[in-house]
From Swiss-Prot:
Record's protein name: GTP cyclohydrolase 1
UniProt source species: Escherichia coli (strain K12)
Gene that specifies this protein: folE
InterPro entries: GTP-CH-I_C/QueF (IPR043133), GTP-CH-I_N (IPR043134), GTP_CycHdrlase_I (IPR001474), GTP_CycHdrlase_I_CS (IPR018234), GTP_CycHdrlase_I_dom (IPR020602)
Enzyme class: hydrolase
Positions of disulphide bridges: none
Family in the record: Belongs to the GTP cyclohydrolase I family.
Pathway in which the depicted protein is active: Cofactor biosynthesis; 7,8-dihydroneopterin triphosphate biosynthesis; 7,8-dihydroneopterin triphosphate from GTP: step 1/1
GO molecular function, one term: zinc ion binding
Binding, Zn(2+): C111, H114, C182
Superkingdom in the source lineage: Bacteria
Catalytic activity: GTP + H2O = 7,8-dihydroneopterin 3'-triphosphate + formate + H(+)
Length: 222
């Protein structure tokens, strides 16, 4: 893995140790993003031709390149820890020891089984120990892990482990409520169902009062 920020390396190592890292094979060789996009575009051209689409049409001719750019630079950019957000931690000088909650964090991810959209919102809470984190960094961590092929259960746990690792405390909780387009747009084609996943650590798991306070915040969000 190329040189990473200390925070990115710590989070990656923590996820690997817990068996929660996204399934990735070791690269056969290092590849720059432009080469990667060119190869993906070539394979996408073959797929579209197998579907009998006419890539000479001006509406379709750039589609393989658009998809390749979207995969590498956007919706799968979270596969590259070089894109892990810069983290700002602040000493907890005020000795904050109550729950900090961020609600309605929008996320868009991709189902790793069918490569279609997962669209949802996250609620994240933590009880500070020695440090507090810049609030926007929580949103960025959620979005980083969402920008991968995902299953919602793993996504929820990855966000939890990342924040526990960075904040030096187990007292973190994450809940995600999302619509899966592999359910909405294909198969059963259920347009109204949603999936909720929750991952609790520390006091959020062991203390009934703390857990209920978090779940009340989640219900308020819904």
């Amino acid at each position: 893995m190329p040189s990473l920020s200390k925070e990115a390396a710590l989070v990656h190592e923590a996820l690997v140790a817990r068996g929660l890292e996204t399934p990735l094979r070791p690269p056969v060789h290092e590849m720059d993003n432009e080469t990667r996009k060119s190869l993906i575009a070539g394979h996408m051209t073959e797929i579209m031709q197998l579907l009998n689409l006419d890539l000479a049409d001006d509406s379709l001719m750039e589609t393989p390149h658009r998809i390749a750019k979207m995969y590498v630079d956007e919706i799968f950019s979270g596969l590259d820890y070089a894109n892990f957000p810069k983290i700002t931690l602040i000493e907890n000088k005020m000795k904050v020891d109550e729950m900090v909650t961020v609600r309605d964090i929008t996320l868009t991810s991709t189902c790793e089984h069918h490569f279609v959209t997962i669209d949802g919102k996250a609620t994240v809470a933590y009880i500070p120990k020695d440090s507090v984190i810049g609030l926007s960094k929580i949103n960025r961590i959620v979005q980083f892990f969402a920008q991968r092929p995902q299953v919602q259960e793993r996504l929820t746990q990855q966000i939890l482990i990342a924040l526990q690792t960075l904040l030096g405390t187990n007292n973190v909780a994450v809940s995600i409520d999302a619509v899966h387009y592999c359910v909405k747009a294909r198969g059963i084609r259920d347009a109204t169902s949603a999936t909720t996943t929750t991952s609790l650590g520390g006091l959020f798991k062991s203390s009934q009062n703390t857990r209920h306070e978090f779940l009340r915040a989640v219900r308020h969000h819904n």
